[in-house]
Amino acid sequence: VNTSEIADRFEIADTLYRYARAVDTKDWDLWRSVFTADATVDYSSAPAGRSGSRDEIAAWLEESFAFVTVSQHFITNIEYSFEGDRAQVRAMFYNPMQFVGMTELSTCGGNYHHSMVRTETGWRSERLHEESLWFVNSPLAQDD
């Protein structure tokens, strides 16, 4: 590993942490800044999840997170595979959250799979696929 790759790893990790902060603070402009303008985002493995363009998913998240009073995304175990100005990135996530009208905490976890590209303004995700592995106390289960 050379010093350039170490710097790239730090910058990509910072991008992932900015993603988490954007979701948890409901800053959808900041969330958009993590992605290229033509990025695709796939949350279809999550309960009631969707996939679409960056802007379509930002609008959906803004609507969906109106029902989330607090969330905290932890991103860890980041793995990188570089090929020139591109990188495949896998990172685990753990997300406790509180939904409107629910007294108990909900939690979920899984993996983020990013296809990242180096741009003039830093590393950006051009494709995100969320691999949702588990969800405890889903608000959707409350409808049963």
Task: Annotate each language-model stretch with its function.
Residues 1-37:
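Short, low-complexity N-terminal intrinsically disordered segments enriched in polar/charged residues
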Residues 2, 39, 118-120:
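Intrinsically disordered/low-complexity terminal segments and short unstructured peptides
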Residues 2, 6, 48-51, 103:
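Charge-dense, low-complexity intrinsically disordered segments
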Residues 21-22, 53, 115-119:
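Intrinsically disordered, low-complexity regions enriched in Ser/Pro/Gly/Gln/His and often acidic
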Residues 28-94:
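A solvent-exposed, acidic/Ser-Thr-rich amphipathic alpha-helical stretch
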Residues 65-144:
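A beta-strand edge to alpha-helix "cap/lid" segment located at domain peripheries
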